[in-house]
């Protein structure tokens, strides 16, 4: 056809105009199909998110009040390679999270142990990612997922497996703005110093901030470990003493007058009568021995109205107290101490390796050096060592903090031990009920025990003669009437006896070489702190 271009398609001749018309129609049809597919895909995603909506969310109070049949939670500490492939349910705090592409990496923390959890959008939907992403740090969550091998070794968690999350629920939301971040509170001093050198100064959480917000502070791995170690010290203490025939007792903490006749007591009104909080179970321990209990111990609170605001003084602490009948000589008490504490130290090493490692990560320290046979020096020998080192000390006075530290260094250098005993102390620096040394009344049948150059306990043989006891009480300025029931206990016959007392917090502080006793007191009470 002249003036007209003819095309052939499938044997049919069509004009160019008709071809364009058909192409436009086809393109319109394709666009319609794309729109339908997009709509279908969108509906599919909505349906998917709708179907996944039961896999995440906040748990209601009613749900928390109801029992869940067959529910079993796995501790984060038990998430190990041996259970890779298993589906587990775990609970913990949201330590932190990080979004990388379509994957949300969540670090979950439980009692100082951490695990990486992976939430993938392709598996759980965008809405679940959004839900998890907006949860604030320290919120309590539960999740269900499969234990898997990570693609690369993990360095930011305690567990070397990861959880591929299927479901996650929030049991309790934390406030978004925290007074301290647990991650900051868990940072070691060396890491803080290193960050400064690298030009990225990390936050340092100060002691008062920690103690004012103790409920957050004790969530750090090191603090979790410290109080687990403390628990094991008590267990080992009880275990050893019970194996030696000791009976655990509980003495009153409300008493008339003053505990040991000292001024450092918390006085109070007791129904119109003057009273105080016991600064020692000493008197009642002795009365128990007079009641033929022979060997007793107590784990309980002790109150001291200390004015000292130092790294090692508290106004309330846990006392580990022992009293025992003496069969032959007061050295029997020292023999007991010399066996008891190495037993405790050994048990802690055996039972708390993970906890000790957690403490070391934040507060590096070397294991305590002690001898199989506990070193025992006289007070005079200790004074002589200090004098030979050029220290000026009173031969009949008590050792101050600096003298204790110096003597600890000298003992470590000479005897290769950080745990030792110093006995036969001057009578002038001992309580009124301490038995004088038979060969020289300037000294007494008493001793102190030291760890890493600091005194942790005092012990002695007690005076069991009522006349001598009255005499010593008057010499110390004590009103005998206020302790008459105590003295009367010895008028009915009393066996020779003695004992010792030690602060649990101080033992743990020195065992872990910590620089402040407040780190080993759950909610410390000192001369300036009564809360939280």
From Swiss-Prot:
Chain positions covered by the region annotation Aspartate: 282-285
Positions with a binding annotation for ATP: 304-306, 312-314, 455, 503-506
Keyword Coiled coil carried by entry: yes
Residues annotated as binding Mg(2+) 2: 455, 458
Region (Disordered): 31-58
Catalysed transformations (reactions): tRNA(Asp) + L-aspartate + ATP = L-aspartyl-tRNA(Asp) + AMP + diphosphate
Pfam families per record: tRNA-synt_2, tRNA_anti-codon
Positions with a binding annotation for L-aspartate: 260, 304, 458, 462
Protein name: Aspartate--tRNA ligase 1, cytoplasmic
